[in-house]
Amino acid sequence: MAAPGAPRSLLLLLLAGLAHGASALFVVKDSNGTACIMANFSASFFTIYETGHGSKNSTFELPSSAEVLNSNSSCGRENVSEPILTIAFGSGYLLTLNFTRNATRYSVQDMYFAYNLSDTQHFLNASNKGIHSVDSSTDIKADINKTYRCLSAIQVHMGNVTVTLSDATIQAYLLNSNFSKEETRCTQDGPSPTTVPPSPSPPLVPTNPTVIKYNVTGENGTCLLASMALQMNITYMKKDNMTVTRALNISPNDTASGSCSPHVVTLTVESKNSILDLKFGMNGSSSLFFLQEVRLNMTLPDANVSSLMASNQSLRALQATVGNSYKCNTEEHIFVTKEFSLNVFSVQVQAFKVESDRFGSVEECMQDGNNMLIPIAVGGALAGLVLIVLIAYLIGRKRSHAGYQTI
């Protein structure tokens, strides 16, 4: 019969596997065996590719077999090159993080992803074949000699690919070949629990913004329907040469307008000090819509440079099939430039084709789907555990009865 402690131990193992099975530790070392980069995270990849019958989506995870590609990774050389972490998996897949630093901070300046369209496991019936690559800057950054920590999902949009890092712990330019105990928390997590701003200062992260409904109408009717809450993260240098990051909520009192055209739908939100443009586009076959550009013009009265202009025209966020609506309850963080990023909360949006001023069929974001998988997986594990304990009990009972048989 099973030992009394076995079911409890089995349950702990099952839950531990569910919580940490997807994460992996990647370490880059110099020629002396000293670690200079450490990264621990799980990753998922959302890719749009073309087939003979239009666009298709492919979603896959960073496998447990992924490992550091030492030939492409490096600790860098001072004043010559910067540290690089390259992770290899599958047949030709590469995820590369290029680091850089200044006097006070280090960052992942660029993320590069190479994928293999000849891999039929992930890209069935792809029109194009071979290795393709995309890259983008990121807002992964931390103070020197501190660990970058982010419990929230980090999304990096790279053209037709979105890379999502989860439960990330990253540090480059290591001092003692290990993660620092001091952390810099990502903006998605909010301020660090140990960070207490001076009492006269307003909090760095305000309450969540209000969900606002937007409607853009053209000559042929409604071309954009949206319900979402928006928050702008602005980093700038004040007149006293102090660098600050502020989170500013879009208010229901701000003026909203927009325009419709066959290939671009624009939503403009204007306040006293800022003009925010969100531009939606379509893919080549006009089967998908997505947020392709975010542009901000802002006046900053207390800044060294009083005006801020930021734009990114190569985004691929908030994407769904034309005629359907994109919906995501999870907060999304859209990186625009190193000075500006946009947080989107509780979003539902539909562009180009809107029937009867109502949202079409819903396409949920990957993050919401992942959140549902955890309770389902835990429930499945517990059900399996109950079955195992029941079988062990019945086997033990049968053996006990066998011991009393007449000889």
UniProtKB/Swiss-Prot annotation:
Location of the region described as Hinge in the Swiss-Prot/TrEMBL record: 190-219
Membrane topology value: Single-pass type I membrane protein
Highest taxon, organism lineage: Eukaryota
Post-translational modification: O- and N-glycosylated; some of the N-glycans attached to LAMP-1 are polylactosaminoglycans.
Region annotation First lumenal domain: where it falls in the sequence: 22-189
Pfam families: Lamp2-like_luminal, Lamp2_2nd
Disulfide bonds: 36-75, 150-186, 223-260, 328-365
Carbohydrate-modified residues: 32, 40, 57, 72, 79, 98, 102, 116, 125, 145, 160, 178, 215, 220, 233, 241, 253, 283, 297, 304, 312
Biased composition (Pro residues): 194-206
Lumenal compartment segments: 22-371
Signal peptide segment: 1-21
Region ranges (Second lumenal domain): 220-371
Location of this chain's protein in the cell: Lysosome membrane; Endosome membrane; Late endosome membrane; Cell membrane
Record's keyword annotation contains Membrane: yes
Keywords: Cell membrane, Disulfide bond, Endosome, Glycoprotein, Lysosome, Membrane, Signal, Transmembrane, Transmembrane helix
Disordered: annotated segments: 183-206
TM segment ranges: 372-395
Residues in compartment: Cytoplasmic: 396-407
Molecular-function GO term, any one: ion channel inhibitor activity
Protein purpose: Lysosomal membrane glycoprotein which plays an important role in lysosome biogenesis, lysosomal pH regulation, autophagy and cholesterol homeostasis. Acts as an important regulator of lysosomal lumen pH regulation by acting as a direct inhibitor of the proton channel TMEM175, facilitating lysosomal acidification for optimal hydrolase activity. Also plays an important role in NK-cells cytotoxicity. Mechanistically, participates in cytotoxic granule movement to the cell surface and perforin trafficking to the lytic granule.
Subunit note: Interacts with ABCB9; this interaction strongly stabilizes ABCB9 and protects ABCB9 against lysosomal degradation. Interacts with FURIN. Interacts with TMEM175; inhibiting the proton channel activity of TMEM175.
Database matches in PANTHER family: LYSOSOME-ASSOCIATED MEMBRANE GLYCOPROTEIN, LYSOSOME-ASSOCIATED MEMBRANE GLYCOPROTEIN 5
Family stated for the protein in its record: Belongs to the LAMP family.
Protein name in UniProt: Lysosome-associated membrane glycoprotein 1
Source organism per UniProt: Cricetulus griseus (Chinese hamster)
Encoding gene per record: LAMP1
